[in-house]
Curated annotation (Swiss-Prot):
It comes from Oryza sativa subsp. japonica. This is Probable trehalose-phosphate phosphatase 9. Keywords: Hydrolase, Stress response. Its cofactor is a divalent metal cation. Its EC number is 3.1.3.12. GO terms for biological process: trehalose biosynthetic process. The keyword Hydrolase applies. It comes from the Eukaryota. CDD domains: HAD_TPP. InterPro entries: HAD-like_sf (IPR036412), HAD-SF_hydro_IIB (IPR006379), HAD_sf (IPR023214), OTSB-like (IPR044651), Trehalose_PPase (IPR003337). GO terms for molecular function: trehalose-phosphatase activity. It catalyses: alpha,alpha-trehalose 6-phosphate + H2O = alpha,alpha-trehalose + phosphate. Removes the phosphate from trehalose 6-phosphate to produce free trehalose. Trehalose accumulation in plant may improve abiotic stress tolerance.
Length: 374
């Protein structure tokens, strides 16, 4: 694989023909692509004030923590093995298929998108302790030296930057509502240059409202229900219930919904043992992926009629959460690109491939670096 080689997904998710790739400056020039004002207008045009009321929040919360079936061990093991084998046929290991994938589309430019929690770091009881290993950091650094690389997280952008510690990356915090370009050059100059590295904040007008909702949730949820933790991610809020007694999960959902009745322009979504409070705009990790591709000069939709001159990008998106499904769906709609779900267990997903855990993510990233250097 050359430095602008390609990885390809199965036939139902990829157009196999690959054109000769162009060379791109990295970081990309500020001209071209979609600007910050454009991203704000796009989000405002798609505002949806009636979005995202999931039928039963308690059932949804339980679904984020699947349990083994309470049946005879031998029967349970056989059923689980059969289910896993069937799922792996549809979502094979990205490591096991790597060589075939790497050889399938030489000419496209890889762009790497990575979730943080559960992808680059393990899921832990205390979200403030979700640190990545030095080995993972080295793997991400190696990938970023060869391909445009972005961290796309529900976390506050500054928080995930402090965890990752690599200024040469793009960071899309708050589920893509706070996007900043590489800050290594800007950080050395400070001031105006650092401000210029902010590419997109489509929900800036919601900041006062989110601050008020945060204070209310801390009082009504974190201050009342043992184990609950409310995290301010700047443009969204996370209500963690991983450490809450399951018998109180319903109370968590009820209290959160009670607070949000006073904020009809905020909506509630579900993650892995976390309730997410976001502005009611049509902006998510999938839209962040589109925006970043366009800002890099590629076609956001995957065709030559969109913002890019042609479509020689091959996006690889790796994530473990429900919120990453928005990005996986975008890759499916593009017709090519690799969506990779990080999970030990079968899940409904739009991803084409799978990896079991952050350890396998690290191995996959290292293989990308090795292939690019060959």
């Amino acid at each position: 694989m050359t430095k602008h080689g390609a990885v390809v997904v199965p036939e139902d998710a990829v157009v196999a023909a690959a054109a000769v790739g162009r060379h791109f400056s990295f970081p990309p020039p500020r001209t071209g692509g979609v600007g910050g004002d454009s991203c704000k207008k796009l989000a405002a045009q798609q505002i949806d004030l009636g979005a995202a009321v999931i039928g039963s929040w308690l059932d949804s919360m339980k679904a984020s923590s699947p349990r083994h079936r309470l049946v005879a061990p031998a029967v349970a093991a056989a059923a689980a093995d059969a289910e896993h084998d069937e799922w792996m046929e549809k979502h094979p290991s990205a490591l096991g298929k790597f060589e075939a994938l790497a050889a399938a589309a030489k000419g496209k430019r890889i762009v790497v998108f990575l979730d943080y929690d559960g992808t680059l770091s393990p899921i832990v009881e205390d979200p403030d302790r979700a640190v990545m290993t030095d080995e993972m950091r080295d793997a991400v650094r190696g990938v970023a030296a060869r391909f445009p690389t972005a961290i796309v997280s529900g976390r506050c952008r500054d928080k995930v930057l402090s965890f990752v510690g690599l200024e040469e990356l793009y960071y899309a915090g708050s589920h893509g509502m706070d996007i900043q370009g590489p800050t290594n050059a800007a950080a050395s100059k400070g001031g105006e240059e650092e401000e210029e590295s902010v590419l997109c904040q489509p929900a800036r007008e919601f900041l006062p409202m989110i601050g008020e909702a945060y204070a209310a949730l801390v009082e009504k949820v974190e201050g009342v229900i043992p184990g609950a933790k409310v995290e301010n991610n700047k443009f969204c809020l996370s209500v963690h219930f991983r450490r809450v007694d399951e018998r109180r999960w319903g109370a968590v959902a009820d209290q959160v919904r009670a607070v949000l009745r006073g904020y009809p322009r905020l909506r509630l979504t579900q993650g892995r043992k976390v309730l997410e409070v976001r502005p009611a705009i049509k902006w998510d990790k999938g839209e962040a992926l589109r925006f970043l591709l366009s800002a890099l000069g590629f076609s956001a939709a995957g065709d030559v009629e969109d913002d890019g001159d042609d479509d020689d990008a091959f996006p690889i998106y790796i994530g473990d959460d429900r919120t990453d499904e928005d990005a996986f769906r975008v890759l499916r709609a593009r017709g090519h690109g690799a969506g990779i779900l990080v999970s030990r267990f079968p899940k409904d997903t739009c991803a084409s491939f799978s990896l079991r855990d952050p350890g396998e993510v690290k191995d996959f990233l290292r293989k990308l670096v090795t292939c690019a250097a060959a």
